[in-house]
Each structure stands twice: as C-alpha cells, then as structure tokens.
C-alpha cells in the first residue's frame, strides 16, 4: 500500500496551515466541478467528492457558496485539468495535478519548480504507473473490525482497512468513495477525518539527508504555485 495516510498527513500539516492557500485551491476546484456538471452535489458526483474533501479541511460555507454561485452565474472563466510528471533529486517520482486557465504559464512554472531544485519534468506516463489512484476515508470512534463489518454488510469493497494512530483509515478504489462514505454514514458515522481521492505510491524510497532537504524544497515550490492542486510523490519523509 505504500505510505500510511497519517505519514502523509503529518508532513502536509504545516503547509495546510496556510488556510488562505487551501481555501483558494478548493474554491477553484469547486467552481470547476460545478461548472462541468450540475451545481447540485446530489446529481454531480465530482462536486460531491470535492465538497466532502472540503469538509475535512473546514473550508467555510461562504467559500463553497461563492464558487457554486459563480458556476451557476455562467462565468466564462474556464480551467483545464492537467497532470505533469517528473523526477526530483535521486530519481524520486512526482505527480503534479493542476487546474489552469493559462497552460503555457502553468507548464513553465511547474518546469521551473522542478529544474531549480535538482529535478526535471518527465513525459506523460513516466511515473504514474508507479502510483495507484485511491480513495482514502478516515474516521474515529470505530475499530478496523467494526468498519470491516459495516462495509461487508453494505457489500462495499475496500483494498485495506488500517488503524493508524487514533483513526481507522479505509483504502478503496476511487469509484467506491461514495459507497464507503454512505455505508459508514448509515452506520452512524457523522464526521470523517480524511476524505480524499489521491495517488499513493506503490513503493517508497528514502533519500539521503541533503537530497531530502532539496526534495522538500521542490515540493514546497510546486505546492506554492497558484495553479497546482495536488502534489504526489514516492518519498518516505520520515518523522
């Protein structure tokens, strides 16, 4: 399965503390999902996924409503969903997902973030085959056995169910995201600590200390780009 979710979460915590950055990225993602389909999450699964994710980051209702209303209002602002793949120091593998209204700008910015930090862009497919698209659902107040029983009774498949720190984390196929959540909600779960569609590395690598410092600098540079929504990688950043 690669890194446990909490290992990823802990390293993201300091970056995610930048709430204005997080809210801006969610605002854009909600707008795009609402514009591409119905602005109603009941009939728009992509929008429902984004809104469930937003809940776990405590995105204010005002941010959500503003993005949905913008989509309803027929805004002509369009974004392309683009994925870039590349390598960091010591051949570390990186995937960068973006939403952009200026492809040339985004490509140049992403390329610069790689090249200025001992990395380089790769071609499409150069690293993605080493990652698995995964739904990650986290909750508290249940044991892994209880969650397994709930999902089995609801006839919902999961790849893995692990107890990580004080939470239970369910790893499933992306198309099982809503099914997992629905089964748990029906069983009385009201809040989720994690609700993500992510790319998990099949195998992790450990970098020498100097290379890891350079790698973390590169990831920070990528995540700070306005058009970047998510950065995935295969580096075990340790404690």
Swiss-Prot record:
Q: Does the keyword Coiled coil apply?
A: no
* InterPro entries the UniProt entry points to: Integrase-like_N (IPR017856), TACO1_YebC-like_2nd/3rd_dom (IPR048300), TACO1_YebC_N (IPR049083), Transcrip_reg_TACO1-like (IPR002876), Transcrip_reg_TACO1-like_dom3 (IPR026564), Transcrip_reg_TACO1_YeeN (IPR026562), YebC-like (IPR029072)
So which domain of life are we looking at? Answer: Bacteria
Which GO terms of type biological process are on file?
regulation of DNA-templated transcription
What GO terms fall under cellular component here? cytosol
Which protein family is it in?
Belongs to the TACO1 family. YeeN subfamily.
What is the protein's given name? Probable transcriptional regulatory protein BA_0541/GBAA_0541/BAS0510
């Amino acid at each position: 399965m690669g890194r446990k979710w909490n290992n990823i979460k802990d390293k993201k915590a300091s970056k995610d503390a930048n709430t204005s950055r997080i809210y801006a990225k969610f605002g854009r993602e909600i707008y795009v999902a609402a514009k591409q389909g119905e602005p109603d999450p009941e009939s728009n699964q992509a929008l429902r996924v984004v809104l469930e994710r937003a809940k776990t980051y405590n995105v204010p209702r005002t941010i959500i409503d503003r993005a949905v209303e913008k989509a309803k209002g027929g805004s002509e602002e369009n974004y392309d969903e683009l994925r870039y793949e590349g390598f960091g120091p010591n051949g570390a593998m990186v995937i960068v997902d973006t939403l952009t209204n200026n492809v040339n700008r985004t490509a140049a910015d992403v390329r610069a973030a790689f090249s200025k930090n001992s990395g380089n862009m790769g071609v499409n497919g150069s690293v993605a085959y080493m990652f698995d698209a995964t739904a990650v659902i986290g909750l508290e107040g249940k044991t892994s056995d209880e969650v397994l029983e709930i999902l089995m009774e609801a006839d919902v498949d999961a790849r893995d169910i692990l107890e990580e720190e004080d939470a239970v984390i369910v790893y499933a196929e992306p198309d099982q995201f809503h099914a997992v959540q629905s089964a748990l909600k029906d069983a009385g779960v009201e809040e989720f600590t994690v609700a993500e569609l992510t790319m998990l590395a099949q195998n992790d690598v450990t970098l020498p200390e100097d290379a890891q410092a350079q790698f973390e600098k590169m990831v920070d540079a990528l995540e700070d780009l306005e058009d970047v929504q998510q950065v995935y990688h295969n580096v075990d950043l340790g404690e």
